[in-house]
Structures are given as structure tokens and as C-alpha cells.
Amino acid sequence: MSADSTTKFGFVCVQNAGRSQMSTAFAERERERRDLEDSVEILTGGTHPADHVHEEVVEVMGEEGFDLSERTPREVSTDELESCDIVATMGCSTLELDAETVDVRDWALDDPDGQEMEQVREIRDDIEQRVVDLFDEFNPDD
């Protein structure tokens, strides 16, 4: 990422109620930690959004200092996703995006909905590392 350009990350899953919400929260934190608010945009959404973020996700993210209780899953369009530089899907997407303009990465993560809390924590920790790695890839000077 150069100082004069904006990079846009998209995090998407079907319901936008678990994995993509965790990814977004970690990306927002990483963007702030690295002082990249002016150069990194973050988009999140689902192809068939749920009514609320999964309770398990709210709880395990609360353990890490994130309050996702007021977040609302939202629908995301193909046009929105094609405006991203990178789109991370969570392993459940059948999106067909223009591969010439968007780098789509399938993170193939288990769905936390209905899982035991320890499994949800493992998914959370995996997501956190993937997000940090993504920022390292695009901002290696930190």
C-alpha cells in the first residue's frame, strides 16, 4: 500500500453473522493500530444476511475486547465486492467475481454458529492471524 492509494478489503460470508463479522472487527483494529484509517477501507456483508450476529461470536469477541452486540448483518452486492482489492470469503461462498480486478481468497473456515465455545475461540484466533497476515502482506513496512 502506498501512502497515496486506498486499499479496500472485503470480508463476506452467507449470513454476515459470524466469521465475516469477526474478520471485520480484527481488520478495523489492525487498521487503527497501523494508523491506516486514510488508506484502508473495509467492507463486510453477506449474500443472505441473518437477523443478528451469532451469540457465540458476540461472546468470544467480547473476551478480546470487541463489542459486536450492536452490529447488524447486511447484504452485500457483487458490485460492492468488485470494488474491493481483496475479498476474503469464509468458505461458504459461491461468489463469482471478476478475477482480473479482485483477488478472491477463500479462507475455508468452519461456521461458528452452534459450535462449542472452544471451537468458536479457535475460529476467532485463526481469523485474527489471517487478518494480521493480510495487513502484513499489504503493509510490510510495519
Curated annotation (Swiss-Prot):
Keywords in alphabetical order: Arsenical resistance, Oxidoreductase, Plasmid
Q: What high-level taxonomic lineage is stated for the organism?
A: Archaea, Methanobacteriati, Methanobacteriota, Stenosarchaea group, Halobacteria
What this protein is called in its record is Putative arsenate reductase
The record's similarity note reads: Belongs to the low molecular weight phosphotyrosine protein phosphatase family.
Q: Which regions span the lipid bilayer?
A: none
Task: Give the matching InterPro entries.
Answer: Ptyr_pPase, Ptyr_pPase_sf
Q: Which SMART domains match?
A: LMWPc (SM00226)
Describe what happens without this gene. Answer: Deletion of the arsADRC operon results in increased sensitivity to arsenite and antimonite but not arsenate.
Which gene specifies this protein's sequence?
A: arsC
- What is the role of the protein in this entry? Reduces arsenate [As(V)] to arsenite [As(III)].
**Oxidoreductase as UniProt keyword:** yes
Q: Which GO terms describe its molecular function?
A: oxidoreductase activity
Name a biological process GO annotation.
response to arsenic-containing substance
Tell what triggers its expression: Weakly induced by arsenite, antimonite and arsenate.
Q: What else is known?
A: As expression is low no effect on arsenate resistance has been found.
- Xref: Pfam families: LMWPc
For this protein, what is the EC number?
Answer: 1.20.4.-
